[in-house]
Swiss-Prot record:
It is found in: Cell membrane. Keywords: Antibiotic resistance, Cell membrane, Cell shape, Cell wall biogenesis/degradation, Hydrolase, Membrane, Peptidoglycan synthesis, Transmembrane, Transmembrane helix. The keyword Protein biosynthesis does not apply. HAMAP family: Undec_diphosphatase. The gene is uppP. GO terms for molecular function: undecaprenyl-diphosphatase activity. Pfam families: BacA. It comes from Mycolicibacterium vanbaalenii (strain DSM 7251 / JCM 13017 / BCRC 16820 / KCTC 9966 / NRRL B-24157 / PYR-1). Bacitracin is thought to be involved in the inhibition of peptidoglycan synthesis by sequestering undecaprenyl diphosphate, thereby reducing the pool of lipid carrier available. This is Undecaprenyl-diphosphatase. It is a multi-pass membrane protein. It catalyses: di-trans,octa-cis-undecaprenyl diphosphate + H2O = di-trans,octa-cis-undecaprenyl phosphate + phosphate + H(+). It is an enzyme of class 3 (hydrolase).
Length: 276
């Protein structure tokens, strides 16, 4: 990989990871349109470590509070607060993507990054996001979450394994369909992503150096710089996005997704870019 590609894709990763627009889809599209080759699922997974560190830093107080409450409630039934249960919901909600990710890891790294699929997913899932915004009651608080909610949002997170869907788009939409407030759905989705993304990134480190079957190799220095850039840009993006959701809906991103997906389909049909 060239340093220009590393910098551009890392900035793009940081900007899009927390927005409902699909960071993996954007990286796959940008790689083919501007660099004529896919950086690969392994590079994407490793660069996501930077954005997940950004989530850890941004939610540090929340995470510490949840961990303390979880351990306290584990040994003292009388101290089982909402944060204690939230800790359990994050653990339970991580199970679906762990299972699906292991079962379909080869498909995710190769066939799922076909630009026809990416562009189609970008467009189709836009309507799911719009429906979630339209039908969501936005009445439920964190104290009202149950294990069923965590399983459903966890299953929705599995959809993000398909580039073009969007992890935040899928989890926030699921939360809205379940009646959660928009900001709660976003925060819960971001917390839910931490274990899965860290596991995926660490698991993909060897393949980022020597990709198997697709993608280009990256040096250790390039991967380190990628993680740092994604962290800095990602921290700014998550802070902005959560403030944005307080007063605005995700409709703003629906139109963008449809336009981008359509443009990619046109470029593919015209033979301007390669699908794989």
């Amino acid at each position: 990989m060239s340093w220009l590609q590393v910098v551009v894709l890392s900035v793009l990763q940081g900007l899009t990871e927390f927005l409902p627009v699909s960071s993996s889809g954007h990286l796959a599209i940008a790689s083919r349109v501007f660099f004529e080759d896919d950086a690969g699922a392994s590079f994407t997974a490793v660069s996501q470590l930077g954005t997940e560190v950004a989530v850890l830093v941004y939610f540090a107080r929340d995470i510490v509070r949840i961990v303390k409450a979880w351990f306290a409630g584990l040994f003292r039934a009388g101290q089982r607060s909402a944060d204690y249960w939230l800790g359990w919901w994050v653990i339970i909600g991580t199970i679906p993507i762990s299972v699906v990710g292991l079962l379909f890891k080869d498909e995710i790294r190769t066939g799922a990054r076909n630009l026809w699929l990416v562009a189609t997913a970008m467009i189709v899932f836009s309507f799911v996001i719009a429906a979630a915004e339209y039908y969501g009651r936005q009445a439920r608080r964190v104290e009202q979450l149950t294990w069923r909610d965590s399983i459903i949002v966890g299953l929705a997170q599995c959809l993000a394994l398909v580039p073009g869907v969007s992890r935040s788009g899928a989890t926030i939409s699921a939360g809205l369909f379940l009646g959660m407030h928009r900001e709660l759905a976003a925060r819960f989705g971001f917390l839910l992503a931490i274990p899965a993304v860290f596991a995926s990134g660490l698991f993909s480190l060897p393949d980022a150096f020597e990709p198997v079957g697709e993608g280009m190799s990256a040096s250790g220095a390039q991967l380190f710089v990628s993680i740092v850039i994604a962290f800095v840009v990602g921290y700014a993006a998550v802070a902005w996005f959560l403030r944005f959701l307080v007063r605005h809906s995700m409709y703003w991103f629906v139109g963008y997704r449809i336009v981008l997906g359509t443009v990619v389909l046109v470029l593919l049909s015209a033979g301007v870019v390669s699908a794989i």
